[in-house]
Amino acid sequence: MASQGTKRSYEQMETDGERQNATEIRASVGKMIDGIGRFYIQMCTELKLSDYEGRLIQNSLTIERMVLSAFDERRNKYLEEHPSAGKDPKKTGGPIYKRVDGKWMRELVLYDKEEIRRIWRQANNGDDATAGLTHMMIWHSNLNDTTYQRTRALVRTGMDPRMCSLMQGSTLPRRSGAAGAAVKGVGTMVLELIRIIKRGINDRNFWRGENGRKTRIAYERMCNILKGKFQTAAQRAMMDQVRESRNPGNAEIEDLIFLARSALILRGSVAHKSCLPACVYGPAVASGYAFEKEGYSLVGIDPFKLLQTSQVYSLIRPNENPAHKSQLVWMACNSAAFEDLRVSSFIRGTKVIPRGKLSTRGVQIASNENMDTMGSSTLELRSRYWAIRTRSGGNTNQQRASAGQISIQPTFSVQRNLPFDKTTIMAAFTGNAEGRTSDMRAEIIRMMESARPEEVSFQGRGVFELSDERAANPIVPSFDMSNEGSYFFGDNAEEYDN
């Protein structure tokens, strides 16, 4: 990134920090993790959960969701003003699973949001600790990215299902702040912008008046976030054009879809963070580990080390494969939904297989599912090596943007070759001359055509032994060139929307 100096690191975004040095950043991220852990311990006490029940990922998700809902100001206000039958706007809750007489039972719990907020603040030294809330949102988002393929959402906005590798963070709430914006993929931003433009086309008052002014500010801010993800001058110039449009309409939508397609080769920079479920942080804090004192990073060895020693359990449906459930959660914990499967497999030390071959549904259990036949098992979340998370998009040459990996948004900074069939991608660009100034388009298409698939991304970068905390001895893996390991292709993952 050319403007690297002006960018805040993820950890600064994560902790709303001003400029901090590495030690301060590690401490403030650690403080955030401490808070989540303390909150989780307190909630397990409130709910009278056994140690095993407290380590159940489904219980963790319910507890995380309760606190996120308790702090969702906008929705809380909406619920107060639009009361719906049988829903108390002041309460939040969800399913909690307990082991009774050798069987799993579902118990629906309900708490005052005020009470949950009190427990959360108490665990966070009286602060609202927004960073911790965002952290949990990103964990939920990473889990969704791994579980569901967003083809329907893509098709609805006129994009191509092959662009699913651009959809990281597509289920993050709007209120997820700078840390949330950093992990959103190019496709996610394009989708949000298209939705806004479409509303403007259908509603003539959308851009007018006081509300319209706020909308306009939001629109321009989203354009700037997306612009910041692109790494070539031509893509950025096109974003300026979209942002400055007096009356955004179909021409802008065309431009955005064109830009999204171009991002399949000229990859955007999208951050990756390892956000773990609260039931990992809780037991670690309970066992006496002081995250703030020791320091913690979301993009280094720390999450790997934490997962090496964590016991996490999951409910398993009768026909699900526990190993496959483990893979799903492992990928979510490492933010690896769009990583090359060859790279993930090497790091994990066991073969990581495509979504369509996994015999497992999502982690959450629907309220109408039968608990009688429900089992549980340990999730295997350990790894053989660790690697540094990247945000570069894997373009081999930052100055003149070259081939990033198609259908992949790299998570780990690990050398790999770029096996891809550029012709398929380029075919998407022929005969599409709508939209305006074609000089920028011509420039972008020229860059894409000159991208060479035989180049190597992240040259010389490797994985590290778990004993190598200082990342001193990189092990550069060699991969089988022939097939690129895309998680979602040739595949029938469930839809997030259904």
Swiss-Prot record:
One GO term describing the cellular component: viral nucleocapsid
Main location: virion
Bias type Basic and acidic residues, positions: 8-21
PTM info: Late in virus-infected cells, may be cleaved from a 56-kDa protein to a 53-kDa protein by a cellular caspase. This cleavage might be a marker for the onset of apoptosis in infected cells or have a specific function in virus host interaction.
Motif Unconventional nuclear localization signal: positions: 1-18
Motif Bipartite nuclear localization signal per record, residues: 198-216
The protein's role, per its UniProt record: Encapsidates the negative strand viral RNA, protecting it from nucleases. The encapsidated genomic RNA is termed the ribonucleoprotein (RNP) and serves as template for transcription and replication. The RNP needs to be localized in the host nucleus to start an infectious cycle, but is too large to diffuse through the nuclear pore complex. NP comprises at least 2 nuclear localization signals that are responsible for the active RNP import into the nucleus through cellular importin alpha/beta pathway.
Keyword Aminoacyl-tRNA synthetase: no
Name of the protein in question: Nucleoprotein
Family that this chain belongs to: Belongs to the influenza viruses nucleoprotein family.
Positions of region (Disordered): 1-21
UniProt keyword terms in alphabetical order: Capsid protein, Helical capsid protein, Host nucleus, Host-virus interaction, Ribonucleoprotein, RNA-binding, Viral nucleoprotein, Viral penetration into host nucleus, Virion, Virus entry into host cell
Matches recorded under HAMAP family: INFV_NCAP
GO biological process, one term: viral penetration into host nucleus
Organism: Influenza A virus (strain A/Brazil/11/1978 H1N1)
Description of how the protein assembles with itself and partners: Homomultimerizes to form the nucleocapsid. May bind host exportin-1/XPO1. Binds to viral genomic RNA. Protein-RNA contacts are mediated by a combination of electrostatic interactions between positively charged residues and the phosphate backbone and planar interactions between aromatic side chains and bases.
Domain of life: Viruses
Location(s), subcellular: Virion; Host nucleus
GO molecular function, one term: RNA binding
